[in-house]
Amino acid sequence: MNSEGIKLSLVKMIKDKRGVSFVEIENFFDEIGFDYLGDEMINSGENKKIIYWCDWNEQACGVIIELVKDELVEMTPANPLIYIWLTGKV
């Protein structure tokens, strides 16, 4: 699946579920066989010290950043318990 197809599928998933976590996005990437792992991160455009997610490659970060810039999705803080529930990690 190309970047545009990934973006369309992500927007649909996010709208259908009324929001998703980065863990759920990674699970989606795994399901479609998209190689997202790397050394890049998504951080706040206003404060580079605020990191939203890391260990993705440039293409994966670009997909999310483009969706946010195009105002197709928005990033909002999630309850940390969601990540514990989804990953089983504390």
How should these model regions be labeled?
Residues I82-V90:
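Short, amphipathic alpha-helical interaction segments positioned at domain boundaries
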Residues Y52-K69, M75-A78:
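Short amphipathic alpha-helical interaction segments
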Residues E31-E58:
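Short, positively charged loop/turn segments that connect secondary-structure elements
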Residues M1-V23:
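Positively charged, polyanion-binding regions of nucleic-acid-associated proteins
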